[in-house]
């Protein structure tokens, strides 16, 4: 025959009797040990659950200047570690767990597991590794690149969208992307401004050569007209000086 025995609150005071008397008596928390000590002029109390139980609520309490405990909603529940939780999934444990117990996780249909599919209850009342989550295999709406946009309104598993850029911009990255297990298949693309291409050096040289050629042809034509007119260079120079003087006089 087996009997269950509830272990009532055990209290250990590591402060002077006068300080301890100023703080009110705490309500009992079954299956726990409460240790109080003085820290920087305040009474600090800590709950520790016995083996096979885990803490729910606040672990550490302060007896403040008003000689009141700041919180008393604490309890020790059966099971060495907190009950496992997995939204949109299930796990192998069906009752209170003990130290070193292991559980496995599995997600419901249309959800994918993110994290480890196993976890173990440790001596310090924690699970390791942390519990996973079950994430929908559908995707969240994608973002728009700066100076760009996407086309498509279906974000479910297997659906595709296409990215485009505004006028005078070009796309850098993957244009068409697919929803795969809750994630888009590629990173968000970027829209970059189309820069006017600079003229090549050979084109610049060709332009300079053409201008020089045109200048030479103009000089040859001028010299030919001068020769045909019978005017000498001295007469041309004198004529230009007269024209210059006439223009200057008109400006005055």
From Swiss-Prot:
Transmembrane segments: none annotated. Residues 21-78, 79-136, 137-193 form the Sushi domain. SUPFAM superfamilies: Complement control module/SCR domain. Keywords: Complement pathway, Disulfide bond, Glycoprotein, Immunity, Innate immunity, Repeat, Secreted, Signal, Sushi. The keyword Chloroplast does not apply. It is found in: Secreted. One of its GO terms (biological process) is positive regulation of protein catabolic process. Disulfide bonds join 23-63, 49-76, 81-121, 107-134, 139-179, 165-191. InterPro entries: Sushi/SCR/CCP_sf, Sushi_SCR_CCP_dom. Residues 1-17 form the signal peptide. Glycans are attached at residues 64, 71, 98, 117, 154. GO terms for cellular component: extracellular region; extracellular space; plasma membrane. Pfam families: Sushi. Its main location: secreted. The keyword Transmembrane helix does not apply. Controls the classical pathway of complement activation. It binds as a cofactor to C3b/C4b inactivator (C3bINA), which then hydrolyzes the complement fragment C4b. It also accelerates the degradation of the C4bC2a complex (C3 convertase) by dissociating the complement fragment C2a. It also interacts with anticoagulant protein S and with serum amyloid P component. The beta chain binds protein S. Disulfide-linked complex of alpha and beta chains of 3 possible sorts: a 570 kDa complex of 7 alpha chains and 1 beta chain, a 530 kDa homoheptamer of alpha chains or a 500 kDa complex of 6 alpha chains and 1 beta chain. The central body of the alpha chain homomer supports tentacles, each with the binding site for C4b at the end. This is C4b-binding protein beta chain. It comes from Homo sapiens (Human).
């Amino acid at each position: 025959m087996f009997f269950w025995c509830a272990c009532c609150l055990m209290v250990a005071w590591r402060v002077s009797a006068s300080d301890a008397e100023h703080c009110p008596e705490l309500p009992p928390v079954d299956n726990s040990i409460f240790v109080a000590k003085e820290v920087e002029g305040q009474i600090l109390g800590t709950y520790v659950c016995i083996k096979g139980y885990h803490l729910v609520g606040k672990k550490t309490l302060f007896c403040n200047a008003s000689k009141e405990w700041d919180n008393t909603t604490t309890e020790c529940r059966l099971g060495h570690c907190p009950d496992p939780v997995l939204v949109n999934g299930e796990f192998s444990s069906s009752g209170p767990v003990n130290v070193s117990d292991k559980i496995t996780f599995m997600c419901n249909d249309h959800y994918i597991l993110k994290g480890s599919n196993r976890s173990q209850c440790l001596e310090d009342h924690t699970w390791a590794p942390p519990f996973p989550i079950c994430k929908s295999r559908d995707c969240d709406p994608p973002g728009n690149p700066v100076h760009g946009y996407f086309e498509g309104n279906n974000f479910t598993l297997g659906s595709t969208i296409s990215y485009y850029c505004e006028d005078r911009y070009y796309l850098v990255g993957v244009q068409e992307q697919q929803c795969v297990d809750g994630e888009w298949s590629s990173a968000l693309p970027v829209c970059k401004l189309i820069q006017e291409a600079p003229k090549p050096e050979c084109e610049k040289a060709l332009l300079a050569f053409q201008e020089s050629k045109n200048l030479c042809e103009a000089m040859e034509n001028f010299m030919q007209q001068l020769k045909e007119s019978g005017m000498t260079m001295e007469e041309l120079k004198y004529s230009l000086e007269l024209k210059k003087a006439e223009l200057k006089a008109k400006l005055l």
